[in-house]
Amino acid sequence: YFRDLPRADCSPAEALYILQGNYQGFTQYDIGKVFSSTILNLSLKKIIKIEEIPDGGKNDSKITILPQDTNSVSLNSDEIIILNFLITACKNKSKSIFGGSKESDNPNEITMKELKKYISNNSSKVVSLKSAIDKAIKSKLTSNRILDLKGIKRRNANMAGCSIGVF
């Protein structure tokens, strides 16, 4: 529910982090949800455009990074991290996926098929992306006094003590 979120400008990653209550960072399953929902949020903010394109009888989606006035839209740090990942994927898709650039390649566009291939071929960049998002979210939420690191440490210590007592 929207009313459960702490702020109107809360990013999808912040919302998931708060609502899950697991302050150790995102799991590998969570990062896919965060990535997808942030892409949709960037589309709503008109930072990117998502459109369906035909792909040999199947439908694919194309993400286009739109030109921006640097002062027009405010993005959260985790949204900037994911946008930069998309920009890098767009620029490097032809080199890493097809072995060379094509003349028709637009450095501001990538299909979902190309993005999935880029992600699967660059697992270390995905690990770095997850780490950067975890750090950005924790920093933003603690600086806004939504999370208290001391309280989280106490909670984790109590949880560890409980699990040791159970075994």
Question: What does each model-found stretch correspond to?
Answer:
Residues Y1-A160:
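Short, amphipathic alpha-helical interface elements at domain boundaries
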